[in-house]
């Protein structure tokens, strides 16, 4: 930074207004840079938070889908088991109805020859 001196006779004056203005410009640049950095950091943090939230939501959705699939499979297995049990019961009933319970005894029938 250049300092300007004005000589009037034996006295020298420093242009303090120019110095103050230059200093203010530099301070504003630093301040703006800091603000920009803070804004960038905040934006990055927000983006990271959003990404984390999205990942958590995706994980929750995947877990829910997996649980639904497990429940559907369990329900399907239960239905199949119930159907098998019903079929077995029907087969047992049919077998019982078709089976003969005749016991041969010569004295049971009075046969005329």
From Swiss-Prot:
Reading the lineage from the top rank, the first entry is Eukaryota
Q: Where is this region: Disordered?
A: 31-113
Low complexity compositional bias, start-end: 32-98
Record protein name field: Putative uncharacterized protein DDB_G0283431
The biased composition feature labelled Polar residues covers 99-113
Which organism was this protein described from?
Dictyostelium discoideum
């Amino acid at each position: 930074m250049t300092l300007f001196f004005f000589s009037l006779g034996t006295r020298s004056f420093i242009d303090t207004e120019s110095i103050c203005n230059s200093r203010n410009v530099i301070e504003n640049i630093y301040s703006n840079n800091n603000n920009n950095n803070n804004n960038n950091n905040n934006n990055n943090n927000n983006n990271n938070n959003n990404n984390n939230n999205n990942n958590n939501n995706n994980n929750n959705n995947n877990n829910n889908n997996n649980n639904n699939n497990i429940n559907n499979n369990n329900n399907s297995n239960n239905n199949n088991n119930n159907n098998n049990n019903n079929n077995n019961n029907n087969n047992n009933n049919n077998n019982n109805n078709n089976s003969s319970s005749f016991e041969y005894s010569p004295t049971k029938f009075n046969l005329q020859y």
